[in-house]
Swiss-Prot record:
This is Glycogen synthase. It comes from Prochlorococcus marinus (strain MIT 9313). It catalyses: [(1->4)-alpha-D-glucosyl](n) + ADP-alpha-D-glucose = [(1->4)-alpha-D-glucosyl](n+1) + ADP + H(+). Residues 488-499 have a biased composition (Basic residues). Belongs to the glycosyltransferase 1 family. Bacterial/plant glycogen synthase subfamily. Keywords: Glycogen biosynthesis, Glycosyltransferase, Transferase. HAMAP family: Glycogen_synth. GO terms for molecular function: alpha-1,4-glucan glucosyltransferase (ADP-glucose donor) activity; alpha-1,4-glucan glucosyltransferase (UDP-glucose donor) activity.
Length: 499
Protein backbone atom coordinates (compact mmCIF):
# COMPACT_ATOMS: atom_id res chain seq x y z
CA UNK A 1 0.00 0.00 0.00
CA UNK A 2 1.01 3.62 -0.53
CA UNK A 3 0.84 5.44 2.81
CA UNK A 4 1.55 9.12 3.43
CA UNK A 5 2.15 10.33 7.00
CA UNK A 6 1.28 13.99 7.63
CA UNK A 7 2.34 15.49 10.95
CA UNK A 8 3.75 18.57 12.66
CA UNK A 9 6.57 16.59 14.30
CA UNK A 10 8.96 13.83 13.32
CA UNK A 11 11.78 12.55 15.51
CA UNK A 12 14.68 12.99 15.70
CA UNK A 13 14.63 16.31 13.78
CA UNK A 14 11.49 17.82 15.31
CA UNK A 15 10.21 16.40 18.59
CA UNK A 16 8.16 18.14 21.25
CA UNK A 17 5.92 15.32 22.47
CA UNK A 18 5.10 11.68 21.85
CA UNK A 19 3.73 12.38 18.37
CA UNK A 20 7.27 12.99 17.14
CA UNK A 21 8.34 9.55 18.34
CA UNK A 22 5.39 7.87 16.62
CA UNK A 23 5.92 9.61 13.28
CA UNK A 24 9.65 8.92 13.43
CA UNK A 25 9.38 5.22 14.32
CA UNK A 26 6.11 3.79 12.96
CA UNK A 27 6.76 4.44 9.22
CA UNK A 28 9.97 2.33 9.04
CA UNK A 29 8.19 -0.50 10.87
CA UNK A 30 5.43 -0.35 8.22
CA UNK A 31 8.03 -0.18 5.45
CA UNK A 32 9.44 -3.50 6.69
CA UNK A 33 6.01 -4.95 5.87
CA UNK A 34 6.59 -3.98 2.20
CA UNK A 35 4.50 -0.82 2.16
CA UNK A 36 5.54 2.35 0.33
CA UNK A 37 5.56 4.79 3.24
CA UNK A 38 6.45 8.47 2.92
CA UNK A 39 6.26 11.48 5.22
CA UNK A 40 5.33 15.14 4.83
CA UNK A 41 5.81 17.91 7.38
CA UNK A 42 6.30 21.68 7.55
CA UNK A 43 9.68 22.92 6.35
CA UNK A 44 10.80 24.44 9.64
CA UNK A 45 13.80 26.74 9.40
CA UNK A 46 16.10 24.55 11.47
CA UNK A 47 15.62 21.56 9.14
CA UNK A 48 17.73 23.20 6.45
CA UNK A 49 20.80 22.85 8.66
CA UNK A 50 19.94 19.32 9.81
CA UNK A 51 19.05 17.65 6.51
CA UNK A 52 20.47 17.45 3.01
CA UNK A 53 17.75 19.36 1.19
CA UNK A 54 18.07 20.17 -2.54
CA UNK A 55 17.96 23.82 -3.52
CA UNK A 56 15.24 23.33 -6.10
CA UNK A 57 11.78 22.08 -5.11
CA UNK A 58 10.13 19.17 -6.90
CA UNK A 59 6.82 21.04 -7.20
CA UNK A 60 5.23 24.40 -6.57
CA UNK A 61 1.62 24.98 -5.66
CA UNK A 62 -0.79 27.57 -4.36
CA UNK A 63 -3.41 27.47 -1.63
CA UNK A 64 -5.11 29.87 0.78
CA UNK A 65 -3.87 32.73 -1.40
CA UNK A 66 -0.20 31.80 -0.90
CA UNK A 67 2.38 29.97 -2.98
CA UNK A 68 4.38 27.11 -1.48
CA UNK A 69 7.08 24.71 -2.59
CA UNK A 70 7.58 20.99 -1.96
CA UNK A 71 11.14 19.83 -1.27
CA UNK A 72 12.10 16.16 -1.27
CA UNK A 73 14.76 14.69 0.99
CA UNK A 74 15.06 11.56 3.13
CA UNK A 75 14.65 10.81 6.80
CA UNK A 76 18.12 10.85 8.42
CA UNK A 77 17.54 7.68 10.47
CA UNK A 78 15.47 5.38 8.26
CA UNK A 79 15.97 6.77 4.75
CA UNK A 80 12.26 7.01 3.92
CA UNK A 81 11.19 9.77 1.51
CA UNK A 82 10.48 12.99 3.40
CA UNK A 83 8.66 15.95 1.85
CA UNK A 84 8.85 19.45 3.30
CA UNK A 85 6.30 22.20 2.72
CA UNK A 86 8.34 25.32 2.10
CA UNK A 87 6.89 28.73 2.98
CA UNK A 88 8.28 31.74 4.91
CA UNK A 89 5.74 31.15 7.69
CA UNK A 90 7.72 28.03 8.70
CA UNK A 91 11.13 29.72 8.69
CA UNK A 92 11.33 30.61 12.41
CA UNK A 93 12.82 28.06 14.79
CA UNK A 94 9.61 27.65 16.78
CA UNK A 95 7.32 24.67 16.25
CA UNK A 96 4.27 25.68 18.26
CA UNK A 97 2.92 28.94 19.61
CA UNK A 98 2.61 32.39 18.14
CA UNK A 99 -0.41 34.31 16.95
CA UNK A 100 -0.29 32.65 13.53
CA UNK A 101 -0.19 29.05 14.81
CA UNK A 102 -3.72 28.23 13.61
CA UNK A 103 -3.04 29.69 10.17
CA UNK A 104 0.35 27.94 9.87
CA UNK A 105 -0.99 24.45 10.43
CA UNK A 106 -4.19 24.97 8.45
CA UNK A 107 -1.96 26.11 5.58
CA UNK A 108 0.22 23.01 6.04
CA UNK A 109 -2.86 20.77 5.95
CA UNK A 110 -4.09 22.46 2.79
CA UNK A 111 -0.67 22.19 1.11
CA UNK A 112 -0.51 18.50 2.03
CA UNK A 113 -3.90 17.95 0.40
CA UNK A 114 -2.71 19.65 -2.80
CA UNK A 115 0.45 17.52 -2.76
CA UNK A 116 -1.56 14.29 -2.40
CA UNK A 117 -3.85 15.28 -5.26
CA UNK A 118 -1.17 16.50 -7.66
CA UNK A 119 2.22 14.93 -6.90
CA UNK A 120 2.11 11.60 -5.05
CA UNK A 121 -1.28 10.02 -4.48
CA UNK A 122 -1.40 7.63 -1.52
CA UNK A 123 -4.01 5.01 -0.83
CA UNK A 124 -3.98 5.98 2.85
CA UNK A 125 -3.28 9.47 4.16
CA UNK A 126 -2.44 9.08 7.86
CA UNK A 127 -3.05 12.33 9.78
CA UNK A 128 -1.87 13.15 13.29
CA UNK A 129 -3.62 15.47 15.76
CA UNK A 130 -5.42 18.73 15.04
CA UNK A 131 -2.60 20.20 12.94
CA UNK A 132 -3.73 17.95 10.08
CA UNK A 133 -7.40 17.82 11.06
CA UNK A 134 -8.74 19.55 7.94
CA UNK A 135 -7.22 16.94 5.62
CA UNK A 136 -9.95 14.31 6.24
CA UNK A 137 -12.56 17.01 5.58
CA UNK A 138 -11.11 17.96 2.21
CA UNK A 139 -10.41 14.32 1.29
CA UNK A 140 -13.92 13.18 2.20
CA UNK A 141 -15.16 13.36 -1.39
CA UNK A 142 -12.09 11.69 -2.94
CA UNK A 143 -12.89 7.99 -3.49
CA UNK A 144 -9.27 7.03 -4.14
CA UNK A 145 -7.69 8.26 -0.90
CA UNK A 146 -8.71 6.94 2.51
CA UNK A 147 -7.87 8.88 5.66
CA UNK A 148 -6.79 7.67 9.08
CA UNK A 149 -6.68 10.13 11.98
CA UNK A 150 -4.63 9.43 15.11
CA UNK A 151 -5.48 11.16 18.40
CA UNK A 152 -2.29 11.75 20.36
CA UNK A 153 -3.80 14.22 22.81
CA UNK A 154 -7.48 15.15 22.68
CA UNK A 155 -6.94 18.21 24.84
CA UNK A 156 -5.49 20.20 21.93
CA UNK A 157 -8.30 20.72 19.42
CA UNK A 158 -7.23 23.43 16.97
CA UNK A 159 -9.03 26.52 15.67
CA UNK A 160 -12.79 26.92 15.88
CA UNK A 161 -15.06 26.84 12.84
CA UNK A 162 -15.59 30.60 12.68
CA UNK A 163 -11.83 31.10 12.49
CA UNK A 164 -11.42 28.40 9.86
CA UNK A 165 -14.04 30.10 7.69
CA UNK A 166 -11.90 33.24 7.70
CA UNK A 167 -8.66 31.40 6.90
CA UNK A 168 -9.58 28.83 4.28
CA UNK A 169 -12.28 27.07 2.30
CA UNK A 170 -14.61 24.99 4.46
CA UNK A 171 -16.76 22.64 2.35
CA UNK A 172 -20.51 23.11 2.54
CA UNK A 173 -20.90 19.65 4.09
CA UNK A 174 -18.40 20.30 6.89
CA UNK A 175 -19.69 19.83 10.43
CA UNK A 176 -17.91 20.15 13.76
CA UNK A 177 -17.12 23.10 16.00
CA UNK A 178 -13.35 22.99 15.45
CA UNK A 179 -10.58 21.16 13.62
CA UNK A 180 -10.41 18.15 15.93
CA UNK A 181 -14.17 17.57 15.81
CA UNK A 182 -14.19 17.83 12.02
CA UNK A 183 -11.34 15.32 11.74
CA UNK A 184 -13.16 12.84 13.97
CA UNK A 185 -16.30 13.13 11.85
CA UNK A 186 -14.76 12.87 8.39
CA UNK A 187 -11.77 10.54 8.80
CA UNK A 188 -12.49 7.03 7.53
CA UNK A 189 -10.86 5.54 10.62
CA UNK A 190 -9.85 7.07 13.96
CA UNK A 191 -7.47 5.61 16.49
CA UNK A 192 -6.17 6.61 19.89
CA UNK A 193 -2.66 5.68 20.97
CA UNK A 194 -3.70 3.08 23.54
CA UNK A 195 -6.76 0.86 24.07
CA UNK A 196 -7.56 2.31 27.51
CA UNK A 197 -7.31 5.91 26.27
CA UNK A 198 -9.71 4.99 23.43
CA UNK A 199 -12.24 3.96 26.05
CA UNK A 200 -11.55 6.87 28.39
CA UNK A 201 -12.12 9.62 25.82
CA UNK A 202 -15.68 8.38 25.37
CA UNK A 203 -16.43 9.44 28.95
CA UNK A 204 -17.15 12.92 30.26
CA UNK A 205 -14.10 12.78 32.55
CA UNK A 206 -11.57 12.45 29.74
CA UNK A 207 -13.56 13.36 26.64
CA UNK A 208 -12.66 17.08 26.60
CA UNK A 209 -16.29 17.89 25.65
CA UNK A 210 -16.06 15.53 22.67
CA UNK A 211 -17.27 12.38 24.42
CA UNK A 212 -20.69 12.59 22.75
CA UNK A 213 -19.14 12.78 19.30
CA UNK A 214 -16.67 10.00 20.11
CA UNK A 215 -19.48 7.72 21.21
CA UNK A 216 -21.29 8.55 17.97
CA UNK A 217 -18.28 7.50 15.85
CA UNK A 218 -17.28 4.59 18.11
CA UNK A 219 -17.70 2.11 15.27
CA UNK A 220 -14.64 3.49 13.51
CA UNK A 221 -12.64 4.21 16.68
CA UNK A 222 -10.03 1.85 18.07
CA UNK A 223 -6.96 1.91 20.29
CA UNK A 224 -3.51 0.88 19.08
CA UNK A 225 -0.67 0.97 21.56
CA UNK A 226 2.46 2.96 20.79
CA UNK A 227 5.85 1.28 20.78
CA UNK A 228 9.51 2.18 21.13
CA UNK A 229 12.53 1.76 18.88
CA UNK A 230 14.35 -1.17 20.48
CA UNK A 231 17.55 -0.49 18.53
CA UNK A 232 17.77 3.18 19.44
CA UNK A 233 16.84 2.47 23.06
CA UNK A 234 19.09 -0.45 23.91
CA UNK A 235 20.88 -0.37 27.29
CA UNK A 236 23.29 -2.99 26.02
CA UNK A 237 24.61 -0.68 23.28
CA UNK A 238 23.80 2.84 24.53
CA UNK A 239 26.99 4.87 24.12
CA UNK A 240 25.65 7.71 26.25
CA UNK A 241 25.72 5.49 29.36
CA UNK A 242 28.88 5.18 31.47
CA UNK A 243 28.23 1.43 31.63
CA UNK A 244 26.03 -0.76 29.45
CA UNK A 245 23.96 -3.63 30.80
CA UNK A 246 21.20 -6.07 29.94
CA UNK A 247 18.50 -8.09 31.66
CA UNK A 248 20.92 -10.93 32.42
CA UNK A 249 23.63 -8.68 33.86
CA UNK A 250 22.46 -5.55 35.70
CA UNK A 251 25.84 -4.72 37.23
CA UNK A 252 26.32 -1.73 34.93
CA UNK A 253 23.34 0.03 36.52
CA UNK A 254 25.32 0.59 39.74
CA UNK A 255 27.95 2.50 37.75
CA UNK A 256 25.24 4.56 36.07
CA UNK A 257 23.56 5.29 39.40
CA UNK A 258 26.79 6.65 40.83
CA UNK A 259 27.36 8.78 37.72
CA UNK A 260 23.80 10.12 37.94
CA UNK A 261 24.17 11.02 41.61
CA UNK A 262 27.43 12.83 40.90
CA UNK A 263 26.09 14.73 37.90
CA UNK A 264 22.94 15.84 39.72
CA UNK A 265 24.81 16.91 42.86
CA UNK A 266 23.33 14.22 45.09
CA UNK A 267 25.01 12.32 47.88
CA UNK A 268 26.69 9.28 46.33
CA UNK A 269 25.26 6.20 48.01
CA UNK A 270 24.53 2.93 46.17
CA UNK A 271 21.95 1.88 48.77
CA UNK A 272 19.81 5.02 48.53
CA UNK A 273 16.49 4.69 46.70
CA UNK A 274 16.87 6.94 43.64
CA UNK A 275 13.70 8.13 41.87
CA UNK A 276 13.80 9.74 38.43
CA UNK A 277 11.40 11.79 36.33
CA UNK A 278 11.81 12.94 32.71
CA UNK A 279 8.80 14.94 31.63
CA UNK A 280 7.25 18.09 30.32
CA UNK A 281 6.52 20.06 33.48
CA UNK A 282 2.83 20.63 32.85
CA UNK A 283 -0.42 20.02 34.67
CA UNK A 284 -1.11 16.81 32.74
CA UNK A 285 2.00 15.05 34.06
CA UNK A 286 1.09 15.24 37.74
CA UNK A 287 4.03 17.41 38.76
CA UNK A 288 1.79 19.10 41.33
CA UNK A 289 1.37 15.73 43.07
CA UNK A 290 5.14 15.38 43.29
CA UNK A 291 5.40 18.86 44.82
CA UNK A 292 2.88 17.88 47.50
CA UNK A 293 4.44 14.56 48.58
CA UNK A 294 8.18 15.20 48.28
CA UNK A 295 8.86 16.69 51.73
CA UNK A 296 7.01 13.90 53.50
CA UNK A 297 8.67 11.20 51.38
CA UNK A 298 12.16 12.55 52.05
CA UNK A 299 11.40 12.75 55.77
CA UNK A 300 10.09 9.19 55.98
CA UNK A 301 12.54 7.42 53.63
CA UNK A 302 16.15 7.69 52.51
CA UNK A 303 15.04 8.47 48.95
CA UNK A 304 16.61 10.82 46.42
CA UNK A 305 14.73 12.43 43.52
CA UNK A 306 15.97 13.79 40.18
CA UNK A 307 13.77 15.66 37.70
CA UNK A 308 14.59 16.64 34.11
CA UNK A 309 12.32 18.79 31.95
CA UNK A 310 10.86 22.19 31.18
CA UNK A 311 7.34 23.56 31.24
CA UNK A 312 5.06 25.81 33.23
CA UNK A 313 6.88 28.45 35.21
CA UNK A 314 4.96 27.85 38.43
CA UNK A 315 5.82 24.15 38.44
CA UNK A 316 9.45 24.88 37.58
CA UNK A 317 9.62 27.31 40.49
CA UNK A 318 8.15 24.77 42.90
CA UNK A 319 10.69 22.13 41.89
CA UNK A 320 13.52 24.63 42.17
CA UNK A 321 12.46 25.49 45.71
CA UNK A 322 12.49 21.81 46.67
CA UNK A 323 16.01 21.48 45.30
CA UNK A 324 17.17 24.47 47.36
CA UNK A 325 15.53 23.16 50.53
CA UNK A 326 16.81 19.59 50.10
CA UNK A 327 20.42 19.73 48.86
CA UNK A 328 21.94 16.36 48.14
CA UNK A 329 18.54 14.67 48.03
CA UNK A 330 16.47 16.53 45.42
CA UNK A 331 17.84 17.86 42.14
CA UNK A 332 16.19 19.38 39.09
CA UNK A 333 17.52 20.33 35.64
CA UNK A 334 15.14 22.73 33.93
CA UNK A 335 16.12 21.81 30.39
CA UNK A 336 16.05 18.77 28.14
CA UNK A 337 19.21 16.77 27.59
CA UNK A 338 18.95 13.45 25.76
CA UNK A 339 22.13 12.02 27.28
CA UNK A 340 21.01 12.97 30.78
CA UNK A 341 17.56 11.49 30.12
CA UNK A 342 19.18 8.20 29.15
CA UNK A 343 21.32 8.32 32.29
CA UNK A 344 18.18 8.81 34.40
CA UNK A 345 16.52 5.83 32.71
CA UNK A 346 19.66 3.72 33.13
CA UNK A 347 20.68 4.85 36.62
CA UNK A 348 17.52 5.51 38.62
CA UNK A 349 15.92 2.74 40.65
CA UNK A 350 12.35 3.84 39.89
CA UNK A 351 10.65 6.20 37.46
CA UNK A 352 7.77 8.57 38.27
CA UNK A 353 4.69 9.09 36.07
CA UNK A 354 1.79 10.30 38.29
CA UNK A 355 -0.15 11.56 35.26
CA UNK A 356 -3.52 13.27 35.44
CA UNK A 357 -4.21 11.69 32.04
CA UNK A 358 -1.88 9.84 29.68
CA UNK A 359 -2.91 8.94 26.11
CA UNK A 360 -0.14 6.36 25.90
CA UNK A 361 3.16 7.45 27.35
CA UNK A 362 6.59 6.54 26.04
CA UNK A 363 8.69 7.26 29.12
CA UNK A 364 7.39 4.30 31.13
CA UNK A 365 8.32 1.98 28.26
CA UNK A 366 11.83 3.44 28.10
CA UNK A 367 12.17 3.22 31.88
CA UNK A 368 11.25 -0.47 31.91
CA UNK A 369 13.56 -1.10 28.96
CA UNK A 370 16.41 0.39 31.02
CA UNK A 371 15.53 -1.35 34.28
CA UNK A 372 13.95 1.59 36.10
CA UNK A 373 10.73 0.42 37.78
CA UNK A 374 7.78 2.73 36.95
CA UNK A 375 5.51 4.22 39.62
CA UNK A 376 2.42 5.29 37.69
CA UNK A 377 -1.21 6.25 37.99
CA UNK A 378 -3.74 3.81 36.51
CA UNK A 379 -4.80 5.93 33.57
CA UNK A 380 -4.65 5.74 29.78
CA UNK A 381 -1.75 3.88 28.24
CA UNK A 382 -0.17 3.37 31.65
CA UNK A 383 -2.91 0.82 32.38
CA UNK A 384 -2.05 -1.08 29.19
CA UNK A 385 1.72 -1.10 29.69
CA UNK A 386 2.44 -1.29 33.44
CA UNK A 387 0.78 -4.23 35.24
CA UNK A 388 0.82 -3.71 39.00
CA UNK A 389 3.44 -5.54 41.04
CA UNK A 390 2.16 -8.51 43.03
CA UNK A 391 4.74 -9.54 45.67
CA UNK A 392 2.91 -12.78 46.45
CA UNK A 393 2.88 -14.21 42.94
CA UNK A 394 5.90 -12.17 41.73
CA UNK A 395 4.10 -10.69 38.74
CA UNK A 396 3.78 -7.18 37.35
CA UNK A 397 6.34 -4.59 36.28
CA UNK A 398 5.54 -1.48 38.34
CA UNK A 399 3.63 0.22 41.14
CA UNK A 400 0.22 1.73 40.37
CA UNK A 401 -2.29 3.95 42.14
CA UNK A 402 -5.86 4.86 41.25
CA UNK A 403 -6.97 8.32 42.34
CA UNK A 404 -5.22 11.54 41.40
CA UNK A 405 -4.63 12.33 45.07
CA UNK A 406 -1.40 13.00 47.02
CA UNK A 407 -2.15 10.27 49.55
CA UNK A 408 -2.55 7.64 46.82
CA UNK A 409 0.68 8.69 45.11
CA UNK A 410 2.55 8.78 48.42
CA UNK A 411 1.31 5.30 49.34
CA UNK A 412 2.53 3.91 46.02
CA UNK A 413 5.94 5.53 46.57
CA UNK A 414 6.28 4.02 50.04
CA UNK A 415 5.25 0.61 48.69
CA UNK A 416 7.93 0.83 46.03
CA UNK A 417 10.55 1.96 48.58
CA UNK A 418 9.75 -1.00 50.82
CA UNK A 419 9.98 -3.39 47.86
CA UNK A 420 13.37 -1.91 46.91
CA UNK A 421 14.78 -3.13 50.22
CA UNK A 422 14.27 -6.74 49.08
CA UNK A 423 16.98 -6.69 46.42
CA UNK A 424 16.47 -10.16 44.93
CA UNK A 425 12.77 -9.54 44.31
CA UNK A 426 13.56 -6.05 43.02
CA UNK A 427 16.06 -7.45 40.53
CA UNK A 428 13.42 -9.86 39.22
CA UNK A 429 10.98 -6.95 38.95
CA UNK A 430 13.51 -5.01 36.88
CA UNK A 431 14.19 -7.99 34.64
CA UNK A 432 10.48 -8.54 33.95
CA UNK A 433 10.16 -4.96 32.79
CA UNK A 434 13.27 -5.16 30.61
CA UNK A 435 12.02 -8.24 28.77
CA UNK A 436 8.60 -6.81 27.82
CA UNK A 437 8.04 -6.50 24.06
CA UNK A 438 6.80 -3.03 23.17
CA UNK A 439 8.46 -2.78 19.78
CA UNK A 440 6.97 -0.85 16.88
CA UNK A 441 6.92 -4.07 14.85
CA UNK A 442 3.98 -5.31 16.90
CA UNK A 443 2.10 -2.02 16.61
CA UNK A 444 2.79 -1.85 12.86
CA UNK A 445 0.82 -5.05 12.31
CA UNK A 446 -2.21 -3.48 13.97
CA UNK A 447 -1.91 -0.34 11.84
CA UNK A 448 -1.48 -2.45 8.71
CA UNK A 449 -4.71 -4.27 9.49
CA UNK A 450 -6.50 -0.95 9.98
CA UNK A 451 -5.20 0.29 6.60
CA UNK A 452 -6.46 -2.88 4.92
CA UNK A 453 -9.80 -2.45 6.64
CA UNK A 454 -10.22 1.15 5.54
CA UNK A 455 -9.23 0.35 1.95
CA UNK A 456 -11.75 -2.49 1.78
CA UNK A 457 -9.24 -5.35 1.58
CA UNK A 458 -10.99 -8.47 2.83
CA UNK A 459 -8.03 -10.79 3.29
CA UNK A 460 -6.09 -10.43 6.56
CA UNK A 461 -2.45 -9.39 6.38
CA UNK A 462 0.10 -12.21 6.84
CA UNK A 463 0.85 -12.85 10.51
CA UNK A 464 -1.25 -9.83 11.44
CA UNK A 465 -2.07 -9.41 15.07
CA UNK A 466 -5.72 -9.38 15.98
CA UNK A 467 -6.77 -5.76 16.15
CA UNK A 468 -9.03 -5.12 19.10
CA UNK A 469 -12.04 -2.99 18.22
CA UNK A 470 -14.01 -1.16 20.84
CA UNK A 471 -17.75 -0.71 21.01
CA UNK A 472 -17.51 2.41 23.11
CA UNK A 473 -20.96 3.90 22.81
CA UNK A 474 -24.50 2.82 23.32
CA UNK A 475 -26.74 2.01 20.38
CA UNK A 476 -23.83 1.69 17.93
CA UNK A 477 -22.78 -1.37 15.96
CA UNK A 478 -19.07 -1.11 15.09
CA UNK A 479 -19.11 -3.87 12.49
CA UNK A 480 -22.13 -2.30 10.79
CA UNK A 481 -20.53 1.14 10.71
CA UNK A 482 -17.32 -0.29 9.25
CA UNK A 483 -19.30 -2.15 6.57
CA UNK A 484 -21.24 0.99 5.73
CA UNK A 485 -18.05 3.04 5.45
CA UNK A 486 -16.42 0.52 3.11
CA UNK A 487 -19.62 0.29 1.06
CA UNK A 488 -19.64 4.06 0.58
CA UNK A 489 -16.02 3.95 -0.57
CA UNK A 490 -16.79 1.22 -3.10
CA UNK A 491 -19.86 3.14 -4.33
CA UNK A 492 -17.82 6.29 -4.88
CA UNK A 493 -15.15 4.32 -6.75
CA UNK A 494 -17.84 2.73 -8.96
CA UNK A 495 -19.42 6.09 -9.75
CA UNK A 496 -16.03 7.52 -10.62
CA UNK A 497 -15.41 4.60 -12.97
CA UNK A 498 -18.77 5.14 -14.70
CA UNK A 499 -17.97 8.80 -15.18
Amino acid sequence: MRVLFAAAECAPMVKVGGMGDVVGSLPPALAKLDHDVRLIMPGYGKLWSLLDIPTDPIWRGQTMGNEFAIYETSHPSNGLPLYLVGHPVFDPERIYGGEDEDWRFTFFASATTEFAWNVWKPQVLHCHDWHTGMIPVWMHQDPEISTVFTIHNLKYQGPWRWKLDRMTWCPWYMQGDHTMAAALLYADRVNAVSPTYAREICTSEYGESLDGLLNYISGKLRGILNGIDLQDWDPGNDKSLPATFNADDLSGRAVNKQALQQRMGLEVNPDTYLLGMVSRLVDQKGVDLLLQVTERLLAYTDSQIVVLGTGERGLESGLWQLAIQNPGRFSVFLTYDDDLARLIYGGSDAFLMPSRFEPCGISQLLAMRYGSVPVVRKVGGLVDTVPSYDPIHQTGTGFCFDRFEPVDFYTALVRSWEAFRHRDCWRELQQRGMTQNYSWDRSALDYEQMYRDVCGFKEPSPDAAVVEQFSLGQGSDPSRQNQDSNAKKRTRRKKKGND
